[in-house]
């Protein structure tokens, strides 16, 4: 169970020397789903655990993603892409959207979406690690492989596993 092993790995990593941690898990309860669409906070979670990105990607067969595409969003055939990025750059005097709206009122025709790096890159199928780490991204992973990866780390940090069910 991914949620259980995420919790165990985090607790074992941060509190392992002061607690005894046991995870109860049943092999009889199958894994629900295989592919997992993640969001950017997973990068922070992995950093908390000291997991390097290359090791994580290899272990989970991860691919990069810059947002989530929703098909048939409001109507059949309509799509919506929720980018992980921010739009434009705020100024000390006002948020970017105020400048963009002012531009629209004065004949500017660019969509607000044109000012989101992650959205533009996703729509063009491009990705790069930028030196300033300003690209917001996440991963699509094999959740079963991630659970196994975290289990290995949690057990190495002292977590014990018991086969069973709690009713």
Can you say where each PLM-predicted feature lies in the sequence?
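Beta1/beta-strand and adjacent pyrophosphate-binding region of the FAD-binding site
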Residues: 1-3, 22
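N-terminal Rossmann-fold NAD(P) dinucleotide-binding loop
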Residues: 4-8
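Amphipathic alpha-helical segments that form well-ordered structural scaffolds
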Residues: 10, 41-48, 145-153
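Glycine-rich FAD pyrophosphate-binding loop
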Residues: 10-34
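Dinucleotide-binding Rossmann-like beta1-alpha1 core, especially the glycine-rich loop
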Residues: 30-33, 37-122
């Amino acid at each position: 169970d991914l949620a259980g092993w995420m919790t165990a790995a985090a607790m074992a990593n941060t509190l392992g020397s002061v607690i005894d941690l046991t995870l109860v898990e049943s092999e009889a309860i199958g894994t629900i789903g295989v592919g997992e669409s993640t969001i950017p906070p997973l990068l922070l979670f992995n950093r908390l655990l000291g997991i390097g990105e290359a090791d994580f990607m290899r272990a989970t067969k991860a691919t990069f993603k810059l947002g989530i595409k929703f098909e048939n969003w409001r109507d059949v055939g309509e799509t919506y892409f929720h980018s992980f990025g921010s739009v434009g750059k705020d100024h000390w005097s006002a948020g970017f959207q105020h400048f963009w709206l002012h531009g629209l009122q004065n004949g500017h025709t660019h969509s607000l979406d044109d000012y989101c790096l992650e959205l533009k890159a996703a729509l063009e199928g491009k990705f790069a690690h930028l030196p300033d780490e300003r690209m917001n991204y996440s991963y699509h992973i094999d959740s079963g492989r991630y659970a196994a990866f975290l289990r290995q780390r949690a057990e190495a940090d002292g977590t014990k596993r018991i086969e069973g069910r709690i009713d």
